[in-house]
């Protein structure tokens, strides 16, 4: 195959790692393929003084990448799946989901070993509504302070003494070589992960069969089933980053367990449900779990 493939990517260290990972995988499969990274600065990267929920959500991290594909400047875009909104413009589709890295959240601190180890009124940095909600349940005494920026920026703020601890995704830390900074992998029962956390997705033009065939070898089937279930739940709930929604699927012997969570930071109300079934029913299970949460009052919580 003699072809050039252009990958649209954000310019953060983690985004570049992910794009480079896809580039390396493809070049190994297709020795005659030339892969070029098209580095793009998105609005989400530029606006760092406001929380994502106030400036338009996680779609701000991918819109410019989609425009690059539409204009023919790029062929595909590589994303962290947790940054991909539940609604994708009809001109695009997810062509591949790669094998997931550790999907859990990480407790990172220079002085304390876990959330439980933090002193009263300790300062904890995070900008995630989902993390804030769950932190307030297990440690209502903590001072939770908004923290934006890439992984390196957040770690520097911790090292400069602005926080006693910060919460990040394990996957990003591991991929960037900061796995040793993880003091605690926060257990699922304390902090349910974000929908799609730890997975890399490739977005392409809708019905682009040539590109679809090209990236097909990168698809991880088990991760795909998990993400399909999680995203189906999120889509049915119409959950964005402005509301605390968590979704986490596991697979064992082709049986999927999906846990979903919806909450309200102000009232402290949390709804949490599980559903089980065969992986072939991943999307249906996600919708059914969302409907169970809706029956419990999830829509009212999300409206608030």
Swiss-Prot record:
The entry's keywords: Porphyrin biosynthesis, Transferase
Disulfide bonds: none
Catalytic activity: 4 porphobilinogen + H2O = hydroxymethylbilane + 4 NH4(+)
Cofactor binding, note field: Binds 1 dipyrromethane group covalently.
Record Gene3D superfamilies: Periplasmic binding protein-like II (3.40.190.10), Porphobilinogen deaminase, C-terminal domain (3.30.160.40)
Keyword Transferase: yes
GO cellular component: cytoplasm
Entry-linked InterPro entries: HemC, Porphobilin_deaminase_cofac_BS, Porphobilin_deaminase_N, Porphobilinogen_deaminase_C, Porphobilinogen_deaminase_C_sf
Pathway(s) the chain acts in: Porphyrin-containing compound metabolism; protoporphyrin-IX biosynthesis; coproporphyrinogen-III from 5-aminolevulinate: step 2/4
Keyword match Transferase: yes
NCBIfam families in the record: hemC (TIGR00212)
Note: The porphobilinogen subunits are added to the dipyrromethane group.
Protein name (database record): Porphobilinogen deaminase
Organism, as annotated: Vesicomyosocius okutanii subsp. Calyptogena okutanii (strain HA)
Gene name of this polypeptide: hemC
């Amino acid at each position: 195959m003699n072809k050039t493939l252009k990958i649209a990517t954000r310019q953060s260290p983690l985004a570049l790692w992910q794009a480079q990972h896809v580039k390396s995988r493809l070049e190994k499969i297709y020795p005659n393929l030339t892969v070029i990274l098209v580095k793009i600065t998105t609005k989400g990267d530029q606006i760092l003084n406001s929380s994502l929920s106030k400036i338009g959500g996680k779609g701000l991290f991918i819109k410019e990448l989609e425009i690059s594909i539409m204009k023919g400047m790029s062929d595909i875009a590589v994303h962290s799946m947790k940054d991909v909104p539940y609604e994708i413009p009809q001109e695009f589709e997810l062509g591949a989901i790669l094998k997931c890295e550790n999907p859990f959240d990480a407790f990172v601190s220079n002085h304390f070993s876990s959330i439980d180890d933090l002193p009263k009124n300790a300062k904890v940095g995070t900008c995630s509504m989902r993390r804030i909600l769950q932190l307030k349940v297990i440690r209502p005494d903590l001072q939770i302070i908004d923290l934006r920026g890439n992984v390196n920026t957040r770690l520097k703020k911790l090292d400069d003494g602005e926080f006693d601890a910060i919460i990040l995704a394990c996957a990003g830390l591991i991929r960037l070589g900061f796995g040793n900074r993880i003091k605690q992998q926060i257990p699922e029962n304390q902090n349910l992960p974000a929908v799609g956390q730890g997975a890399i997705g490739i977005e392409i033009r809708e019905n682009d069969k040539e590109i679809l065939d090209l990236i097909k070898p990168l698809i991880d089937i088990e991760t795909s089933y998990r993400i399909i279930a999680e995203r189906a739940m999120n889509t049915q709930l119409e959950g964005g980053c402005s509301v605390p929604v968590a979704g986490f699927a596991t697979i064992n012997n082709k049986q999927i367990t999906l846990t979903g969570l919806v909450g309200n930071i102000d009232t402290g109300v949390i709804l949490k449900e599980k559903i089980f079934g065969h992986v072939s029913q991943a999307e249906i299970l996600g919708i059914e779990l969302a409907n169970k949460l809706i029956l419990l009052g999830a829509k009212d919580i999300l409206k608030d």
